[in-house]
Structure formats: C-alpha cells, structure tokens
C-alpha cells in the first residue's frame, strides 16, 4: 500500500488486523461507525444534512432505500459510501449495481473514480482504467455490474 495510506487501514501480510496495534484497531472501528467523518477526512467530501442521515443509517441497517428526485446527490453519495465500506472493512467485497450497465459505468463508477482520484490520501489498490473494478488485494475488491435478468444477480 502506498505512502500516506491511513495507518488505521494497514494490515499485516497474513491478512489479519494486527491486534497488537490497538490504537489503529480503535481508529478503524471509529471510521467503520462514522462514515461522515471518513468521507470528510479521507475523501474531502462535505455532505448536506440528508446525505449525512443516509450515510449514518448504513451503520445500523442492512438495507437502506432512498427515494428522491433526480440530481439530489444519490449517485455522488453512493460512490463515496462504496469507498468508505471498502476501505473500512478489509477483505470485503463491495458490489455496486444500477438498472443499466450505462448507469453503472458512466454514472456510479465515474463518481467512484473521481472520489478515488481526489482522495486526500493514497488509498491504495488498483483501480482498473476501463472496467468498474477496484482491487485492493486478491480477496478485497469493489466491482460494478448490472443485469436485465434477476436470476443473474447472485
């Protein structure tokens, strides 16, 4: 991982959190429970009140539905929350989707690329130039896809 990578997100070679470094463990837990702070400190993102409410609702709820008009910042927020989840939950798989592949690539992943490129620190990982995929390690990844057939969504 690159220089400047947040110490709270560094992991040892055995893919296990180094529990001997308790302050970093506490810091990781802090960011897991504070997406608004993570977005501000690491991505430089300022949210408006409703976006903060949506972001914090992910802490306690498995499913969050957002009903809103066009242009309200849902895609902007979803992209940054995907990065928050990925980088605060090591060795996770973050799946992003939208109703069409065009929306995945041209909207959601465009926002992910912007947030990743403009992060205040080097987040690490390998953001593929054309594909909707950000790989941090072999089994630590964020990918985007869509399908017209619900059976394929597995």
Residue ranges: model-predicted function:
Residues 1-154:
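Phosphate/NTP-binding elements of NTP-utilizing enzymes
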């Amino acid at each position: 991982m690159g220089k400047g990578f947040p110490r709270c997100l560094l992991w040892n070679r055995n893919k296990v959190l180094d529990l001997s470094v308790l302050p970093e463990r506490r810091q990781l837990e802090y960011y897991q429970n504070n997406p608004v702070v993570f977005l501000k400190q690491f991505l430089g993102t300022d949210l408006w009140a409703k976006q903060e409410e949506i972001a914090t609702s992910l802490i306690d709820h498995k499913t969050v539905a957002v009903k809103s008009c066009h242009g309200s910042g849902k895609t902007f927020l979803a992209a940054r929350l995907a990065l928050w989840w990925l980088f605060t939950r090591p060795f996770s798989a973050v799946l992003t989707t939208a109703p069409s592949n065009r929306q995945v690539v041209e909207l959601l992943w465009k926002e992910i690329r912007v947030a990743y490129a403009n992060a205040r620190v080097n987040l690490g990982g390998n953001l593929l130039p054309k594909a909707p995929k950000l790989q941090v390690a072999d089994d630590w990844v964020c990918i985007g896809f869509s399908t017209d057939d619900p059976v394929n969504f597995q």
